[in-house]
Amino acid sequence: MPSKVLIIGAGPSGTACAATLHRLGHEVVVVDKATFPRDKCCGDGLTTNALRILEGLNFDPSRVADWQTCSDVEMRSFSGRKIDLPLPSIGGQFAAIAPRAQLDHALVEHCRDMGITIHEGCAFESITHHDTNGISVRVENLGELTVDYVVAADGMWSPVRKSLGLSTQGYLGEWHAFRQYIGNVHGSANEKLHIWFEKDLLPGYAWSFPLPDNRVNFGFGILRTSDRSTRYMNDLWRDLLTRPHITAVLGEHFVPEDRHTAWPIPARIHDAVRSSGRVLFIGDAVCATDTLTGEGIGQALETGIAAGEAIHECNTAADVRDTYSHKIDSLLLADHRMSSVLSRMLTYPVVARMVLALVDTNNWTRKNFVRWMFEDEARAVVFTPRRWHRQFLARPGAYSAK
């Protein structure tokens, strides 16, 4: 029997959930407090996994004006070692950069073209009724909506979670990131994706992701600790853009655009609240980000699809919750644990240097490491036999038929 579902939040997780439920025959309404297009603090990078999921949702990359594929990656160790990591240049897309202002808007329009109702400028206000028979929600400009399930795709601070009394007091995320668009780029960053493992960022890193028209998305991600204050991170941000090995790849006359933005990164899928009654949490609301790289778009899409499938497959709210949690465990838990271990190891400079030296052993290690890093295979695939297959690190990328 079709369910009526309200999705709160029209980012990648919310739209993926909406598209999944609609395809399976359910009645879906999506609301978002913002009006699109709107910017979203993000590195804008899409891994192979995220690209394959978008393809599976029948999303057309040509909807994104500044969609930029990339096959050349350079990593630099704090020791000065540079490692060229070539992704396949044929056989589909393995990495892409898509500005979130454009990507999220395009996903909203993609859902609308499917016939899904999306209300912009309509913020969640409160839950007015919630029991075993249904849930009612008050939404700005729409009044009270009564549905079978609510899917909260409303971000790390999740007003829905807060309204249910499920927020963690003082939680600021596991990581913090800064980002700024930079124009007039004429160095190698114009075409190549750069990653810098700076000693004062470990286990984090700085990045430069190429965009059309001599622009890049430049930023860094850093583990949040008690000795890394906001002031420390602001000072670090200003210093990064003066380091010679970074300015060299941007070119002499690069121009930062507008102001930099910063955002917390939630990465605790192992103990985050996943559901409550008839409410499921997805994306950043369920803290699904990869704790090794900070990648979150692929994980957001996966949680959205998992929530939609759980609602479709089950007849009771209890079964929906259990099925959704099982799907999350199957999709993300082993990878999260692997990423957590690797992240802790990379905190130590001597270990980070050894790992990067190992990556640079030969062409085979470089080729396969970069495909693993960009989630061509799951993080913990070696330890999860159920995910083994004959085309290990040899599958085509996304959109290979185009």
Residue spans for each PLM region:
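Beta1/beta-strand and adjacent pyrophosphate-binding region of the FAD-binding site
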Residues: 1-13
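Glycine-rich FAD pyrophosphate-binding loop
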Residues: 8, 22-42
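Conserved Rossmann-like nucleotide-cofactor binding loop
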Residues: 13, 36, 157
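Conserved N-terminal glycine-rich FAD pyrophosphate-binding loop of Rossmann-like flavoproteins
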Residues: 35-55
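A conserved beta-strand/loop capping segment in the N-terminal third of enzymes
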Residues: 51-105
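FAD/FMN-dependent oxidoreductases across multiple families
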Residues: 66, 144, 224-310, 315-318
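Predominantly flavin-linked oxidoreductase catalytic cores and closely associated redox partners
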Residues: 110-248
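C-terminal helical "tail/cap" subdomain of flavin- and related membrane-associated enzymes
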Residues: 309-402
